[in-house]
A protein has these predicted regions:
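C-terminal non-catalytic regions of proteins with extracellular/luminal or membrane-system context
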Residues: 1-48, 57, 116-117, 217, ...
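Second-shell residues forming the walls of enzyme active-site clefts
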Residues: 85, 149-158, 248-408, 412-417, ...
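Surface-exposed loop and adjacent secondary-structure segments within mature catalytic domains
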Residues: 26-30, 34, 155-307, 312-317, ...
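N-terminal hydrophobic targeting/anchoring segments and the immediately downstream early-domain regions
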Residues: 7-196, 205-206, 216, 221-224, ...
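Structural recognition of the beta-strand scaffold that forms the well-ordered cores
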Residues: 88-94, 130-135, 162-167, 171-173, ...
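Mid-to-C-terminal alpha-helical segments outside catalytic/metal-binding sites
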Residues: 428-448
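Short acidic, glycine-rich surface-loop motifs adjacent to enzyme active sites
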Residues: 122-140, 232, 312-339, 520-549
């Protein structure tokens, strides 16, 4: 028995020592990363030629074409690409989440509280990544300050490649992760399904222009929307993010939405749109979403695959900067049943060749590897149809399918190994990096990536923006029927009418009618209904994506 206790004690002691050593190494590593970053935080020099000032991003004392705002777009791209090493090129092809402190501070170490587990400095300076998406953010002023600090860090790297920040929608009323990344100080607008209810293209353009201004005020330059999916399956959890089931209406409003955010063409006053989810999310088997393995199948019993492509024609006409394929498997539509981003017939043949799209293709988030803590998987990988492949094999298959960037992961080492082994040619990497750099240049990030912190508070939540959002909310309400009672239409309600309410603010209704707790005594009842759904808890995301049978 003593030997058993000795063995247990030795095992525990060894484990403790290993953990302690790992902790020390971890601390030293990130201390060094932070030290290097803080040491580098002085501004790069500037150059003056013919009365114009330029940023000397590579600090070589001369004006390179990529630093010259007067050079052609293609000349700038090719010059920068020629100066980039393979690590810098590979870094462009990842688009992971990034953490931000509660007060807008840069996170020097991995921080679970920021819904992220890696150091900001590590991502920028070691992994050479320059595209990030945000989840929860602090108040706009703190966010703008954080964004400027982030760009300052990026400026100090060898070539000074600026950061591009992206976001899911932040202007709706739904406040849960994965649907609306709400910021309480942005103006509030209807969800896309509400805009669709108005059928108003000009209103949709106006929303895009206002949302674009508020995004840019805090440094968000890529919108991970609109959703050009069709709501052909009523059990699907994401209908609120679509423009409904009418493909023609969806195409028209998708184009208007993108025009509002981007303008006629990408420029310094644009927010680039990443339209999703090619070739159309929505036809989900049993209504189950493709975030989950049981919802991986997209089915077309009416042979309507092509119908789901129609909204994307609007996106192409509006020159959407990027396209995001969905997780789903288009069952029986191509020669292999694999997720869209792994499917060459979907990306290269259909999107690139048939539809002539040459913009950025970025995968949906987490198709290569899931997210977890200490081996506990919180969110599984959406590697539908290729689960049997290793991570490097998945990366290779997606790149061969035609994607340019991977959302949600930061597996730079794995891609570097594929290039160094010859499994993926550097020429193929260059093809994607060109597309990614083109958007950065078009947005003006190489010339001035910073925001005016003094104006952030004047723009975000501006009174006229809020008022226009409220008017849009009113306009999107659809009256289905107005019965006549005693020769008088039921609506508008009479001032003294007795009203019974459920799931609606009694205080708000009491301004217009008398609220009663008795349904029997009420003249009218106003109920806010929720679509029936099946509670599930197999995955973290299931906690906020309500889906399933409508019984």
């Amino acid at each position: 028995m003593k030997k058993v206790f000795k063995f247990i004690a030795w095992t525990l002691g060894t484990l403790l020592a290993v953990l302690l050593l790992a902790f020390v190494v971890f601390q030293l590593y990130f201390m060094e990363i932070n030290r290097q970053a803080k040491k580098a935080l002085k501004e790069k020099p500037t150059l003056t030629e013919n009365g114009h000032t330029f940023r000397d991003l590579n600090a070589n004392g001369k004006l390179d074409p990529y630093e010259d705002s007067h050079a052609t777009l293609e000349a700038r791209i090719e010059d920068l690409l020629s100066q980039m090493n393979i690590e810098e090129k590979v870094g462009q092809m990842w688009h992971p989440p990034i953490g931000i402190g509660a007060e807008g501070e840069i996170l020097g170490k991995p921080d679970p509280g920021a819904i992220f587990f890696n150091s900001t400095y590590h991502l920028l300076l070691h992994k050479k990544i320059s595209h990030f998406n945000l989840f929860k953010i602090p108040n706009p002023a703190a966010h703008a300050a954080w964004y400027n600090k982030l760009q300052k860090i990026a400026e100090q790297d060898r070539l000074g490649i600026p950061v591009t920040i992206s976001s899911d929608p932040r202007h709706g009323a739904l406040n849960f992760l994965g649907n609306d990344m709400l910021s309480s100080q942005f103006s509030k607008w209807p969800e896309p399904i509400g805009l669709a209810a108005t059928g108003d293209s000009l209103l949709t353009v106006e929303f895009g222009r206002i949302a674009s201004q508020e995004y840019r005020a805090v440094g968000i330059r890529t919108a991970l929307h609109p959703m050009a999916d069709l709501a052909t399956e009523p059990r699907w959890a994401r209908i609120n993010g679509t423009f409904g089931e009418d493909a023609g209406l969806s195409a028209r409003l998708t184009a208007a939405y993108i025009f509002g955010f981007q303008g006629d063409s990408l420029g310094s006053e644009s927010v680039a749109c990443m339209t999703k989810h090619w070739p159309g999310g929505g036809p989900q088997e049993k209504g189950d979403d493709a975030h989950f393995r049981y919802g991986m199948n997209q089915v077309y019993p009416g042979k309507n695959f092509d119908y789901h492509l129609i909204p994307f024609e609007g996106a192409f006409k509006a020159h959407t900067a990027a396209i995001m394929p969905y997780y789903g498997v288009p069952v029986g539509q191509t020669s292999e049943d694999v997720g869209m981003s792994f499917n060459k017939e979907i990306i290269t043949d259909l999107l690139r060749k048939k539809h002539g799209y040459d913009g950025v293709v970025c995968t949906d988030w987490g198709i290569l590897k899931g997210f977890g803590i200490l081996g506990w998987e919180l969110v599984e990988a959406k590697d539908h149809g290729v689960r049997h492949l290793s991570v490097p094999e998945k990366i290779k298959k997606a790149i061969e399918a035609g994607v340019d960037q991977f959302g949600g992961n930061d597996l730079t080492d794995e891609l570097l190994q594929l290039v160094r082994s010859g499994a993926i040619g550097e020429q193929r990497i260059d093809e994607s990096v060109r597309r990614l750099l083109r958007v950065k240049f078009q947005l003006g990030l190489f010339d001035n990536p910073y925001v005016d912190e003094g104006k952030t508070g004047e723009i975000v939540g501006r009174a006229d923006f809020v008022e226009k959002g409220l008017l849009a909310q009113k306009k999107c309400i659809v009256l289905l029927k107005n019965d006549t009672l005693a020769s008088t239409p039921a609506l508008p309600l009479q001032r003294r009418a007795k009203v019974y309410v459920e799931n609606i603010s009694r205080e708000a209704v009491s301004k217009y009618a008398t609220v009663t707790d008795s349904l029997a005594d009420a003249d009218f009842a106003i109920l806010r209904l929720q679509t029936p759904w099946e509670p599930r808890n197999g995955d973290f995301i299931e906690s906020f994506l309500n889906q399933g049978y409508l019984d």
